[in-house]
């Protein structure tokens, strides 16, 4: 799988991405973009604090790299409580989840990333914990086994997923608040890039930040990653100052084009156009044609291409739009 090698893949977290934690917003007033999410969460958090209650359980979903973990941290900071972090694949046994739940303080936030990957056994334990703040666990084995109930303090579960459709209905229905994160607009990304540049001590023009933002695929994680590579280019090839021209040169060298596409995006679109005459083409055939897994196409490649109007998902398969044909300078076929 080539996803891990892609500079603009938001689905993989590089070691240097961890350094971004220092520049992530800590409070809602610092949170840029997602205006509807921000305004709603501001009300929900204030209401919970006025009542002295734990915030309702929160499900955050959307493409990778849009700030689901950041939003979970902000919620905990705004509520003035601790944040405990884990992920679906890590919670292999019911005891793993029980250990985390019994260590929570009142109103604490438990953040489970990739919550769609919870095992059915762990999920069953989660239901009464979310609904009644109770933990039902089995002690012993065989005929001597017995169930005991443990009362839990009121807490907030925040689940994050890129695949909301993979959640079971019983789990999804137990979240009182559901927020979808959308791709960011270019002006918001420009602000994020400029802010990150200041934190990194870089001299960067507004146009330079705009150039990076335009090619960041609507994703803050990618914007910050591109910024670091542009910084490297500016320091080695120039005097370290990042202008629009320097940013464009650096990103062209990295094969990230003006639409934010890299070689995998272009490979996918060209496969649909050249090998399947623009489509429709089934997902399995497309995955085989470009040597990728269907999950990577669905979760990583497709969302941005569809959102930007380059790819269309139809009942018969994927189709390249006229905009995709024009992007490569190829004349689209006449419509019947």
UniProtKB/Swiss-Prot annotation:
Which family does the record assign? Belongs to the RuvB family.
Q: Which SUPFAM superfamilies match?
A: P-loop containing nucleoside triphosphate hydrolases, Winged helix' DNA-binding domain
Please tell me where DNA binds in this chain. 294, 313, 318
Locate the residues binding ATP: 23-24, 65, 68-70, 131-133, 174, 184, 221
Please write the reaction equations for the catalytic activity of this protein: ATP + H2O = ADP + phosphate + H(+)
| Chief subcellular location | cytoplasm
> One biological-process term from Gene Ontology?
DNA repair
The record's note on what follows loss of this gene reads: Significantly reduced survival of cells expressing DNA ADP-ribosyl transferase (darT) mutant G49D.
Q: What is known about its subunit structure?
A: Homohexamer. Forms an RuvA(8)-RuvB(12)-Holliday junction (HJ) complex. HJ DNA is sandwiched between 2 RuvA tetramers; dsDNA enters through RuvA and exits via RuvB. An RuvB hexamer assembles on each DNA strand where it exits the tetramer. Each RuvB hexamer is contacted by two RuvA subunits (via domain III) on 2 adjacent RuvB subunits; this complex drives branch migration. In the full resolvosome a probable DNA-RuvA(4)-RuvB(12)-RuvC(2) complex forms which resolves the HJ.
Write the lineage as a comma-separated list. Answer: Bacteria, Pseudomonadati, Pseudomonadota, Gammaproteobacteria, Enterobacterales
What name appears for this protein in its UniProt entry?
Holliday junction branch migration complex subunit RuvB
EC number annotated for this UniProt entry: 3.6.4.-
Q: Which PANTHER family match?
A: HOLLIDAY JUNCTION BRANCH MIGRATION COMPLEX SUBUNIT RUVB, PTHR42848
State where the protein is found.
Cytoplasm
Binding of Mg(2+) occurs at 69
Tell me which UniProt keywords the record has, alphabetically.
Answer: ATP-binding, Cytoplasm, DNA damage, DNA recombination, DNA repair, DNA-binding, Hydrolase, Nucleotide-binding, SOS response
User: In UniProt terms, what function does this protein have?
Assistant: The RuvA-RuvB-RuvC complex processes Holliday junction (HJ) DNA during genetic recombination and DNA repair, while the RuvA-RuvB complex plays an important role in the rescue of blocked DNA replication forks via replication fork reversal (RFR). RuvA specifically binds to HJ cruciform DNA, conferring on it an open structure. The RuvB hexamer acts as an ATP-dependent pump, pulling dsDNA into and through the RuvAB complex. RuvB forms 2 homohexamers on either side of HJ DNA bound by 1 or 2 RuvA tetramers; 4 subunits per hexamer contact DNA at a time. Plays a role in recovery after DNA ADP-ribosylation, probably via replication fork reversal.
Q: What is known of its domains?
A: Has 3 domains, the large (RuvB-L) and small ATPase (RuvB-S) domains and the C-terminal head (RuvB-H) domain. The head domain binds DNA, while the ATPase domains jointly bind ATP, ADP or are empty depending on the state of the subunit in the translocation cycle. During a single DNA translocation step the structure of each domain remains the same, but their relative positions change.
Q: Which cysteines are joined by disulfide bonds?
A: none
Q: What are the GO cellular component annotations?
A: cytoplasm; Holliday junction resolvase complex
Tell me the enzyme class.
Answer: hydrolase
In terms of superkingdom, the source organism counts as Bacteria
Molecular function (Gene Ontology), one example: four-way junction DNA binding
């Amino acid at each position: 799988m080539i996803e891990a090698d892609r500079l603009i893949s938001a689905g993989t977290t590089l070691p240097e991405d961890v350094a971004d934690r220092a520049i992530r917003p800590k409070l809602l007033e610092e949170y840029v973009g997602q205006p509807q999410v921000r305004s709603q969460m501001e009300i929900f958090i204030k209401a919970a604090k006025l009542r002295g209650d734990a915030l309702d359980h929160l499900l955050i979903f959307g493409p990778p790299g849009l700030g689901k973990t950041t939003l979970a941290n902000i919620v905990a900071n705004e509520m003035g409580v601790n944040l405990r972090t884990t992920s679906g694949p890590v919670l292999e046994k019911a005891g793993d989840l029980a250990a985390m739940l019994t260590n929570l303080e009142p109103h604490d936030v438990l953040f489970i990333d990739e919550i769609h990957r919870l095992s059915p056994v762990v999920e069953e334990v989660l239901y009464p914990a979310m609904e009644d703040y109770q933990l039902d666990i089995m002690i012993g084995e065989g005929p001597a086994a017995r169930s005991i109930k443990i009362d839990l303090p009121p807490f907030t579960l925040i689940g994050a997923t890129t695949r909301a459709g993979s959640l079971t209905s019983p789990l999804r229905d137990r979240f009182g608040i559901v927020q979808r994160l959308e791709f960011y607009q270019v002006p918001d990304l420009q602000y994020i890039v400029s802010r990150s540049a200041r934190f990194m001590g870089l001299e960067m023009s507004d146009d330079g930040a705009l150039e990076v933002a335009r090619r960041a695929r609507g994703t803050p994680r990618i914007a910050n990653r591109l910024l670091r590579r542009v910084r490297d280019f500016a320091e080695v090839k120039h005097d370290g100052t990042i202008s629009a021209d320097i940013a464009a040169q650096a990103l062209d060298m990295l094969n990230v084009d003006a639409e934010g596409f890299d070689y995998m995006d272009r490979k996918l679109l060209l496969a649909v156009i050249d090998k399947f005459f623009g489509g429709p083409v089934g997902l399995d055939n497309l995955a085989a044609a470009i040597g990728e897994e269907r999950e990577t196409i669905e979760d990583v490649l497709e969302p941005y291409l569809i959102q930007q109007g380059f790819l269309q998902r139809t009942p018969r398969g994927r189709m390249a739009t006229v905009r995709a044909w024009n992007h490569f300078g190829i004349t689209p076929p006449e419509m019947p």
